[in-house]
Structure formats: C-alpha cells, structure tokens
C-alpha cells in the first residue's frame, strides 16, 4: 500500500499551505506540502526530501500528528501527518505549487 506524508508548519498561529498547480486529481486545491514515500524511505526522510524539492527549504521533522487511510476508485493509501519546522525563514513556490499562503485555523 502506498504511503504519503505531509508536514504541518505552524507559525504565529497560522499554517502554511500550497495551492497545487492545475491538472491531476488534486490540481488547484490547497494542501499541506508533502508527497509519496519512496521505497526504503522513512516518513522523516520523505518529508525532508519533499520540502527540499517543493519549497527549497531545510526542515526539522517534529512529532507525529495523525494518520488517515484513504480508499476510492483511484487511490488506496495511508497518509501520515507530522509537525514540521522550517529551519530557514524563506520558502519559495515550485512547479508543484503555484502559491504559498498562511492560513488561520478558522480559515482551514
């Protein structure tokens, strides 16, 4: 079964989300950055790699937050969420996200 990870970044009671570029199943939707785990990769290694690829930042992976199993006609996977701390203060958009934005808990 496929495993995916997301990192939840919290700063000043706001959460960092990325707007997916158009196309695919999740195009033009806001999401916590992350992605699929590669073979032999731990959740922490996958998050570090995904944040480097998607946002060009170095991170520290904190505590485990939640796990959710998803199953539908297109997907069957487990999603694991972790607290993430960005070690540098600057994140940038990539080909995966067209925009990054901070949201309050009420906006989520």
Residue ranges and their predicted role:
Residues 1-16, 36:
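Conserved N-terminal beta-strand and adjoining loop/helix that marks the start
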């Amino acid at each position: 079964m496929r495993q995916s990870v997301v990192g939840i970044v919290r700063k000043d009671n706001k959460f960092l989300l990325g707007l997916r570029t158009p196309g695919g199943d999740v195009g033009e939707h806001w999401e916590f950055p992350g992605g699929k785990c590669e073979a032999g990769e731990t959740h922490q290694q996958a998050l570090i790699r995904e944040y480097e690829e998607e946002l060009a930042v170095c991170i520290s992976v904190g505590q485990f937050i939640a796990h959710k199993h998803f199953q539908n006609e297109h997907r069957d996977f487990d999603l694991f969420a972790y607290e993430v701390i960005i070690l540098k203060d600057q994140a940038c958009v990539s080909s995966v996200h067209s925009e990054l934005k901070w949201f309050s808990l009420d906006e989520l």
